[in-house]
Amino acid sequence: MSEGVERSRLAVAGTRTRLLQAGPRDSREALVFVHGNPGSADDWEALVGAAGGTGLRAVALDLPDFGETIAPPGFQHTVLGYAGFLAQGLEALGIDRVHLAIHDFGGPIGLVWAATDVEALASVTLIDTGILPGYRWHRLARIWRTPVIGELFQATATRGAFRWLVNRGEPRGLPRAFLDQMYDHYDRRTRRAVLKLYRDTDDPGAAGAELAKLMAPRDIPALVIWGEHDVYLPAKFAERQRQAFPSAEVHVLPGSGHWPFADAPETVERLLLDFLGRL
């Protein structure tokens, strides 16, 4: 475990989600990390610890049916459902000024939350995610969105196949421990949640224009970090984040793929802490 990171459980929306936290626990201002798929609060452990070490409160939650957190009965595995869960989590933590850090599907989840409480958004860090004008689903997402085929694919995802698939297109390769951590959490409930979430999201680029219209006039401080070789969300979308965040600081990392916080952790930590330190 990273130094200074506390692991606990937090009662939210009828379940007890896993919480990673560092820094002053009573601060109402916090850096809030939202993971993507496949992922969990564990994705952010090192960055939670690093940010907490600067005196900023930092938190990361498991989303329902990811990591070690079981969704409550009736939970909707949709962007709106997860955004509502995030809102309730922030309320339970007493956080009302948010520096949002998001990755992958944590992007639409976090940005939809932000659209409902834009006054609470102090800054945003987008890591291979954000508004995606004109984006069409990648091949793996199309498999997940297809009935029967998606279920068969999920049922046959062995550890070895998972490692190969996730590492595909990653120039540096991802750390073995990171891959195994993701697979260990990729159980039946998470695999079902992934199918539901992707099947509910017909057009991942559709909300971008409305979000940009809402966010752009506010010129919220933003940091964009994108792996140059992301095979799921192409790096051309990095600069397009300025449609929503006109003054965004954009960094496209050579040699990185979809998980730059895993394949270039020192660079991501430096960029994030430098950005937050200037706010």
Which residues make up each language-model segment?
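Flexible "cap/lid" loop of the alpha/beta hydrolase fold
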Residues: 115, 122-152
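Conserved HGGG/HGGXW glycine-rich cap/lid loop of the alpha/beta-hydrolase fold
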Residues: 21-68
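Short beta-strand/loop motif that positions the catalytic acidic residue
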Residues: 218, 224-226
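Alpha/beta-hydrolase fold catalytic core
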Residues: 1-31, 53-56, 95-97, 270-279
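Catalytic active-site module of serine/aspartate enzymes centered on a nucleophile-bearing elbow/loop
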Residues: 248-279
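Acidic catalytic loop of the alpha/beta-hydrolase fold
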Residues: 229-233
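Active-site loop/oxyanion-hole signature of alpha/beta-hydrolase fold enzymes
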Residues: 20, 60-102, 270
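Conserved alpha/beta-hydrolase catalytic His-Asp/Glu region
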Residues: 156-217
